[in-house]
C-alpha cells in the first residue's frame, strides 16, 4: 500500500483595522467585556450593517500579495448557524463569490521551493467569544467585543504533504500579513487562527482511494499544527487498514486536538454547505470595483515581501540563507540592518553583529528592534572600527555593552578610554623585545618545540598593552624575532 498525506489549511486572519467590519465599533483586542458593542454587532432587530471600506482594500492587498485573481464584483452572504456567541443567528461572509481566487505563494522547504495554491480568500466577520471560567460553574459567559471584527479567510489547496510544510506555509502567510501591516497575526490573541483539513490518498494496485477528511480545530500554535497533522496521518492509516472507510462513504468530520495528550478527538460530523443555508445578504449591496482602483491598492500599498527580500539580501550583500531568514522574520530588523549596512564597508560583518550581539540583547530584554536604544549608525561605526583594526573583537564587545548603558557612540567611548587598537609596528616591536628580554626560559622552550611558550609570550604582550595591541601584527613580529634569536 502506498499513500500520500493531503493537507489543506483554512487560515483566519483578524485585520488590524480601526473599526469592525460592518459597524463603527472600535476593533481592539481585550478590554472590558462587552464594552465595544453596538446594536449592529449585537444583532439587535432593526440594526443595519455598513461596509468598512478598509476591509475591502485590505482583501485586495492580500490578493495582490498572494498572486490571486481579484473580482470586480463583491457580494456578501449570510451563513446561518446557531451558536450562543453568534447573536444574529448568521455570520456575514462570502460563499460562492469570494473577492480573491486562484492564488499561490512559495514556501521554503528542506528540498527547495514549493508552490502552494490558494483556492480563495474571502471576507467575513468574527463571532463573539465564549468564556468557560470555572468547571464548577454551570454556566458560560460571552464577550461580544470580538463580534463583527474584520476577518480574511485564506483557503489553500491540499498541496501540503507533511507537518513541516504546513508550518512553513503558515509562517510565510504570517510574514506576508505582517509585512503589509494588515495584522499582528498573534495566535495567542486569536488574530491568526488555523483549521487543518487532513486525509490520505491511498494507492492499492493502481486503484486510488481517499480517506475521510478530518477538519482539526482549536490549534493555537505552529507546534500544535504539526503534532496534530502527524498524529492524524498515523490515525487515518490505521483506520484505513481496519475499516477501509473512504471519503465518498463518510465525507468530512470535525476533530479537536488535545494538546496534553497529543491526540485528535472526534467532535461531530462536519456540516455541509447546504446546512449553512447561505443566502445573499439583503442589507448589503453588490459593489463594483474598477480595475484602476484594484491596481491603485497595489501601487500605493504593496511593499517588498519577505520571499523577495531574502533573494535580494543574498544577492546584494552576500548573506547566507540563515542570515536572511533570521533578518526577514521581522521587517523592522531588515530595515535596521540595511540602514547600518549602507554606511559600512563590510555589510556581512554588520549582519553577523546584529544577528549575534544585537539579537542577544533583544532576547535577554524581551524587546523588539523598535525599542532598541542604539541607532543603526552606531552599529556600522563600531563594525568599521573592527574592520579597520582600530579595536579587537573582544574590546568591541566591551564597548558595545557600554554603548548600551550610556547610549553613546563607540567613537566617544574609544576616545575617552583610549581603547583604540595599537597597530604601530615600532611600538609593537619594542613591547616584543621587552617580553623576550624578560622571558629567556620561554625562548628556550620555544626552541625545544613547545608551542605553549608562544601563547605565554603573546599573553605577556597583551597584558603590557592592556589588550589593545593588534594580535595578528604582534604574533607576526614575535615569530620573526624568535626566528632571529
UniProtKB/Swiss-Prot annotation:
GO terms for molecular function: asparaginyl-tRNA synthase (glutamine-hydrolyzing) activity; ATP binding; glutaminyl-tRNA synthase (glutamine-hydrolyzing) activity. Allows the formation of correctly charged Asn-tRNA(Asn) or Gln-tRNA(Gln) through the transamidation of misacylated Asp-tRNA(Asn) or Glu-tRNA(Gln) in organisms which lack either or both of asparaginyl-tRNA or glutaminyl-tRNA synthetases. The reaction takes place in the presence of glutamine and ATP through an activated phospho-Asp-tRNA(Asn) or phospho-Glu-tRNA(Gln). InterPro entries: Asn/Gln-tRNA_amidoTrfase_suB/E, Asn/Gln-tRNA_Trfase_suB/E_cat, Asn/Gln_amidotransferase, Asn/Gln_tRNA_amidoTrase-B-like, GatB, GatB_Yqey_C_2, Gln-tRNA_amidoTrfase_suB_CS, Gln_synth/guanido_kin_cat_dom. Heterotrimer of A, B and C subunits. This is Aspartyl/glutamyl-tRNA(Asn/Gln) amidotransferase subunit B. Keywords: ATP-binding, Ligase, Nucleotide-binding, Protein biosynthesis. It catalyses: L-glutamyl-tRNA(Gln) + L-glutamine + ATP + H2O = L-glutaminyl-tRNA(Gln) + L-glutamate + ADP + phosphate + H(+); L-aspartyl-tRNA(Asn) + L-glutamine + ATP + H2O = L-asparaginyl-tRNA(Asn) + L-glutamate + ADP + phosphate + 2 H(+). The gene is gatB. Belongs to the GatB/GatE family. GatB subfamily. It comes from Borrelia turicatae (strain 91E135).
